[in-house]
A protein has these predicted regions:
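Positively charged, small/polar-rich N-terminal and surface patches that mediate targeting and assembly
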Residues: 1-117
Length: 117
């Protein structure tokens, strides 16, 4: 991707305690994106929020389990994002946890490549 290129940003809103095959759901999504050749993905940790259950989740020192909102953000060319959504639709429909998925258009302003290890 080059500066000025049009792209799409996919956001998946989930909870930090959501699991898939006994592993954190956010990890599953990140590895799915990587396996499918997506340019990049990041997990953003919220400090407070609520979803369809209307239960407010926040980070409190005295709680044993930290249940906070997470956003998995994935950015790539439109066709790659569309394919990622289509090929993982069944997975997202089957996770059995509250979540919302959004997609919007974005423009690449800068894309600095890191060195592969």
């Amino acid at each position: 991707m080059k500066p000025g290129d049009k792209a799409k940003r996919l956001r998946i809103y989930i909870s930090s305690t959501d699991k898939s095959d006994h592993k954190p759901l956010y990890e599953k999504v990140i590895y799915l994106a990587r396996e499918q050749g997506i340019a990049g993905a990041t997990v953003l940790k919220g400090i407070m929020g609520y979803g369809s259950s209307s239960e407010v989740y926040t980070n409190k020192l005295w709680e044993i389990t930290e249940k906070v909102p997470l956003v998995v953000e994935i950015i790539d060319e439109a066709d790659k994002i569309d394919l990622f959504i289509k090929s993982n639709k069944t997975f997202f429909e089957s996770i059995g946890k509250g979540h919302i998925i959004t997609v919007d258009d974005t423009t690449i302003i800068m894309h600095g490549r890191g060195k592969k290890k």
